Structures are given as C-alpha cells and as structure tokens.
C-alpha cells in the first residue's frame, strides 16, 4: 500500500486512497481523496523550503505587529492578481476559481484551500510547498476556510485578509466572506490591502532568479513576434506565436498586448490590450507589452518591431527621442536614489527633445505590476519605498509621443536594484528598432 502521509502530507479527512481505491466510482470517496500514487512522478520547479519558511516568518512578523492571529492570503487568475498571495505563500499556479485562499496562522500549520477536488487536488499537492491542502468543498470556500480557522481555535481571533486584486482593491468572494462570518461570528476580520506588497517589495535571491528567468522568457516572446510577423497575418496570430515560445520555457504569459499600425498613417501610440483582426502590411510598426512570468514572478519587455525597414520618421524618433530618454531614466536606477529623482528625469527627457509622453515612467514589481507608480506629474508609493534599496524591482515603462499626440512608441525593460546599481532582467539590445523576419 502507498502511504504518502508518511512523507509529511497533512490531511484532515478520512478518504485515504488506500481505503477507498476499490470504490472510486462513489462521489463521496473521490471528492476528498488523498494519499494516492497519482502524480507522484510529476516534477515542478519550486522555490526552496527555506525560501517559503522565510516568507511565512516575514508574514508572521507583520501579523504580530498588527495584532493578527491568522492571515488569509488570497489570489485569483485575473491579470491584476496572477495568483497574488496564494502563489507567494504556497507556490500554487492555477487558473481555477475566482479567488483562492491560504490560511497562515500566527502559530500552527498553514493550509491551502484548493478549488477543485479528486485528481485535480492531488496534482496540486505535488506542485505546492504547503503540506495541508484541502478541497474548496465545491465552491464553499468560506466554509472550508472557516472550518480550518475553528480547528485553530480562532473563534474570537483577529484575522487579516490580503488583497487578491491590487485594483480597488478587491479581497475575496462575497459568499465566502459571508460564510466565514456566519461560522465565526465573534471573530474580527481585518482587510490588509498593502500587506502583501510590504512582504514582496524587497526580493530575495531566489525571487530575483525567477524574475531573471521570466525576463529571458519575455525576450523569447518578443523574438517570436518578430520572427512571425509578415504581411497578410493578423494581430491575434502574433499573440498566438507568443504562447508556444513562452510555454516551451515553462513560463506563463501575464500581459500579452500587441497592436499594429501603418508607419505612414499611425493610429496607435500603445499596444492593443486585445490584439485585433487587423491584417499586417508592409510598412507597419508593431508595438507590444509582453509581461511573462516564471514560478509566479514576472518581468516585462516592450520593443518596436517593423515589417520592412522603419521609416525615417520613426527611426529618427526612436534614436533621438526614445533611446536617449530611456537611457537617462535607466541611469537613475541605483541604491540610495529616490523615486522623485526618477520622476523629475522622466518628466523632462522627452519634453527636452521636442516630444511628450504618456504619464507613466516606471512602476514596481511585486510578483506582477505594483506600487510604486512613478508618473511624470505624481508618485504613488509607500513611505518605506521612496528611496531605492537592493532587492527592489522595477519596470521602466515609457511611451514617448510626438508633440501633436499622433504617433508614439511603447518601450519597456525590467530591473532589480543591486548593491552597485541595477541588474537588467530583460537584457535585450536597445539601440535599434527590430525588423521582422
């Protein structure tokens, strides 16, 4: 008989595969099954146990500071979340459910609530670095979370909830929240919109390595666009070309924004969030924002591609406005420098060259896009991150636009601050427009 429980897997149910394996056609047996031999030969690239222990210890330190007895880490599959706290806390990378949940008590074993059951949850157990993985009870996530909190004696506790979605922000499903309140009427639930950012704005070596891998994958995505683009194709086919390039490297695409227009009659300054059915033609320019992730951590690149030689107008704009402006902003990335210095530089570099730009200059990277947001006219940042420190990660995101507001070029690279400067996470040449083919 198999006994995976002896390998350190914690289960709270009694549907041991060894007991029910002869009656798998009974739904009650299959729904909460565990300890099967299924997927035991699956291999995943994971962060080390020491890295997850570091993360959990850091979270518990903030919990103690804020008087929290437990923390519910949340995350979802949408692009404003990309797994968020659940990916960070457990290593889960999965698209099931509007929101997913992990319980981290101040003292005790963390628990992941997984949306699906049966074979799905057994596969998830091999992917994640949390030993206690339980079913979401067919969408009754709040009930599953609440029952675990009761096991932990949290009936009168202060329980934090991280933001699943950085916009809003949004925290969890309404029904899940109501079910938790019903099960724990004397508990106090506290929304913690910035806690995950406080835990992720400084990266460790393993996280930086994952982001560097994501950067290499982003470069491959850009190269796939350039290799595929030709007259007669449609924009969405460029997006289709990115998918195998990224997935062949074990990555995932987070942002896949691609737009095209004629260099002789330009109609875009920024990539299309929804690549269209537009047919590519000779003399087109392709703008893309390609954010790819590896082990949940992302890096982004944006670089223009033309079908045929770039026109003199675009080539001059790129070499005399885009590239030198980017180099000036990049020169500000160093430990001890301030976000305000970046803002001042970014706000003038294109005006000085007779152009203008979208407001965005740079943003932070937690696992994905995050604060701080540095714009030409304002900064949104937490007090502890206004000065750059080693381990902080950023994406320079520039869109220089001509003074009439008609044409522009999106340009982007990702960086990690080091002891001596900045590590380029997307090391791709910047000096020339990329010509397709």
Question: Where are these predicted regions, by residue range?
Answer:
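Active-site neighborhoods and metal-handling regions in enzymes and metal-associated proteins
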Residues: 1-437
């Amino acid at each position: 008989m198999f006994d995976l429980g002896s390998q350190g897997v914690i289960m709270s149910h009694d549907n041991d595969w060894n007991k029910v394996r002869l009656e798998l056609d009974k739904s009650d047996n299959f729904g909460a099954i565990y300890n099967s031999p299924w997927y035991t030969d699956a291999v995943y690239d994971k962060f080390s146990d020491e890295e997850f222990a570091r993360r959990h210890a850091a979270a518990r330190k903030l919990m103690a500071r804020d008087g929290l007895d437990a923390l519910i880490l949340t995350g979802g599959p949408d692009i404003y979340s990309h797994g968020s706290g659940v990916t960070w806390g457990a290593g889960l990378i999965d698209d099931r459910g509007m929101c997913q949940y992990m319980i981290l008590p101040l003292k005790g074993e963390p628990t992941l609530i997984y949306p699906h059951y049966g074979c799905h949850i057994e596969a998830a157990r091999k992917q994640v670095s949390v030993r206690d993985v339980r079913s979401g009870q067919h969408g009754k996530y709040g009930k599953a979370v609440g029952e675990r909190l009761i096991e932990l004696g949290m009936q009168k506790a202060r329980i934090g909830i991280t933001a699943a979605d950085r916009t809003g922000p949004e925290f969890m499903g309404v029904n899940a929240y109501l079910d938790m309140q019903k099960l724990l009427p004397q508990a106090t639930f506290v929304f913690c919109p910035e806690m995950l950012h406080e835990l992720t704005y400084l990266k460790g070596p393993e996280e930086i390595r994952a982001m560097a891998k994501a950067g290499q994958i982003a470069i491959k995505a850009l190269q796939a666009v350039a290799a595929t683009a030709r007259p007669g194709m449609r924009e969405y086919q460029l997006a289709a070309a990115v998918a195998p390039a990224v997935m062949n490297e074990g990555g995932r695409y987070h942002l896949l924004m691609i737009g095209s227009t004629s260099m002789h009659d330009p109609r875009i300054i920024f990539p299309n969030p929804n690549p269209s059915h537009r047919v590519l033609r000779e003399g087109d320019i392709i703008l893309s924002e390609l954010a790819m992730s590896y082990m949940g951590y992302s890096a982004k690149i944006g670089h223009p591609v033309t079908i045929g030689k770039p026109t003199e107008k675009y080539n001059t704009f790129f070499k005399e406005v885009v590239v030198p402006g980017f180099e000036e902003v990049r020169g500000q990335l160093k430990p001890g420098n301030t976000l305000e210095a970046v803002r001042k530089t970014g706000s003038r570099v294109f005006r000085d060259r007779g152009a203008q730009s979208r407001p965005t200059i740079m943003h932070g990277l937690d696992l994905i896009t995050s604060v701080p947001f540095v714009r030409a006219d304002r900064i949104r940042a937490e007090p502890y991150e206004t000065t750059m420190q080693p381990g902080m990660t950023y994406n320079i995101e520039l869109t220089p636009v001509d003074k009439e507001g008609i044409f522009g070029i999106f340009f982007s690279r990702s960086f990690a601050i080091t002891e001596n400067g900045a590590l380029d996470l997307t090391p791709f040449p910047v000096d020339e427009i990329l010509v397709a083919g």
